[in-house]
Amino acid sequence: MSTAVQVDDVMRYRDSRFQTIAAKLLPTQYLVVDDDTALTTTLGSCVAACLRDPVLKIGGMNHFLLPEGQVGDGAPTRYGSYAMELLINDMLKRGAHRKRIEAKVFGGANVLKGFTSNPVGTRNAEFVRQYLQAEHIPIIAEDLCGIHPRKVWFFATTGRVVVQRLPHAHEAEVAATESAVRARLSKAPVTGGVELFE
């Protein structure tokens, strides 16, 4: 089974809905797989990018909290720019070809109260679209913005994605989880680097 190249371990469990092993990604995590593992996450204002090389049938998902940060900010994996580089580079290391990579992107809901003039969900959605366009990675499917949290399942070998929009009752729970992660990461020390592949 494929493993995450990150300090945090990705939780795996048996998903009864799809009768397969699932890997649940939390904010700041990513995972690349080349098997039938379902990559899953729950999103509020965060965004998940699902990338895939359809020839190799390899793919991965990330889950980021904010588009970009300042130099010296803690926990760089919370930022989309860093999370996207990690995901793309891991796929390239495993043999994916940049010109074949395609994307499906999800999340960016405006569920956090008090962020009305420039909501973080909208900024995350704009970031992922602009980033992928700059990298010449086509977005072949998206479900971004709006007001509902989402649960996403991504099957890398087939490219199938299932999105379940969660009822408003889950908004407070998802928003509280994202806010708690943001607070914890703002105090985290800066570590690691990114190796870029062309």
UniProtKB/Swiss-Prot annotation:
Cystine connections: none
Reaction catalyzed: L-glutaminyl-[protein] + H2O = L-glutamyl-[protein] + NH4(+)
Described function: Probably deamidates glutamine residues to glutamate on methyl-accepting chemotaxis receptors (MCPs), playing an important role in chemotaxis.
Full protein name: Probable chemoreceptor glutamine deamidase CheD
A molecular function GO annotation: protein-glutamine glutaminase activity
CDD domains: CheD (cd16352)
Gene giving rise to this polypeptide: cheD
Keywords (A to Z) from UniProt: Chemotaxis, Hydrolase
Organism: Xanthomonas axonopodis pv. citri (strain 306)
E.C. designation(s): 3.5.1.44
Entry's Gene Ontology BP terms: chemotaxis
Similarity comment: Belongs to the CheD family.
EC class: hydrolase
